[in-house]
């Protein structure tokens, strides 16, 4: 099954997505274009399929972590219950206009 990713906020600074994974659900292979922070809402194991192989990551509810842009993976819920986390993608800040220019 496919994980469910409703976007809660999408503006010029961030994209905030709540990811919900039934047991065995996955994101599909993707590459992160932005730096991001993940805040797990549940505790459990995720299996990550990366270009370098598979890794199992243990999420702990409330323990946030940061990753840089460019990460490539497929994320799979590897435990028996639902897995939920909030992902905050951080968009680059546009430089202010030069002095005297509109």
What spans do the regions from the language model cover?
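Short, conserved beta-strand element in jelly-roll/cupin
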Residues: 31-47
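Short N-terminal segments immediately surrounding and downstream of signal-peptide cleavage
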Residues: 1-13, 99
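Extracytoplasmic/periplasm-facing segments of secreted or lipoprotein envelope proteins
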Residues: 9-26
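Short beta-strand His + acidic residue motifs that chelate non-heme Fe in jelly-roll/DSBH
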Residues: 27-29, 47-48, 72-79
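N-terminal post-signal-peptidase region of extra-cytosolic proteins
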Residues: 22-25, 52, 71
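Short acidic-glycine-tyrosine-enriched beta hairpin
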Residues: 53-70
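Ligand-binding loop in jelly-roll beta-barrel domains
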Residues: 70-93
């Amino acid at each position: 099954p496919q994980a469910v990713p409703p976007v809660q906020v999408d503006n010029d600074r961030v994209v905030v997505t709540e990811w919900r994974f039934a047991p065995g659900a996955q994101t599909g292979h993707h590459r992160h274009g932005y730096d991001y922070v993940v805040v797990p809402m549940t505790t459990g194991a995720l299996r990550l399929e990366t270009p370098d192989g598979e890794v199992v990551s243990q999420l702990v509810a409330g323990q946030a972590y940061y990753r840089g842009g460019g990460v490539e993976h497929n994320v799979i819920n590897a435990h028996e219950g639902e897995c939920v986390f909030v992902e905050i993608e951080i968009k680059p800040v546009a430089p202010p206009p030069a002095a005297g220019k509109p």
